[in-house]
Amino acid sequence: MQSRLILIVEDNDDARDALRMLLELDGHVVEAAAEGNEALEIARGKDPDVALVDIGLPGIDGYEVARRIRAADGKRPLLIALTGYGQPEDRRRAAEAGFDSVLVKPVDPNALSDLLATLEIPARGFRG
């Protein structure tokens, strides 16, 4: 699997650290944020290939983070929603906000690896 720059947006320290460790073991470069505004700053500055975004963030929720990333100029990262529920309504709202996929927490490491391996992730553009 190709190494990607992945942004994790998760307010739970343990969940964020576990995801970071899993992704780094798979050879990815990871940036992490605990809340929405921090995530948006990182997304603007680092231009990640993928963003794993918890829906239930304090302050700006994950849906709004996704909408703002989608509205920004530049590359369109693959957006994966992380939710504790996964009900049809959650999936519908995630799609409307601009997410490409939804994973239910706790995230199954194999499901995440499989998702990253099979989904089309846009190639990084020219960065002159």
Predicted segment positions?
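Acidic catalytic/metal-coordinating carboxylates
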Residues: 11, 35-38, 61-67
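Short amphipathic alpha-helix used as the core "switch/output" element in two-component signaling
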Residues: 41, 63-76, 116
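C-terminal output helix
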Residues: 107-116
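Two-component/phosphorelay signaling modules centered on CheY-like receiver
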Residues: 13-31
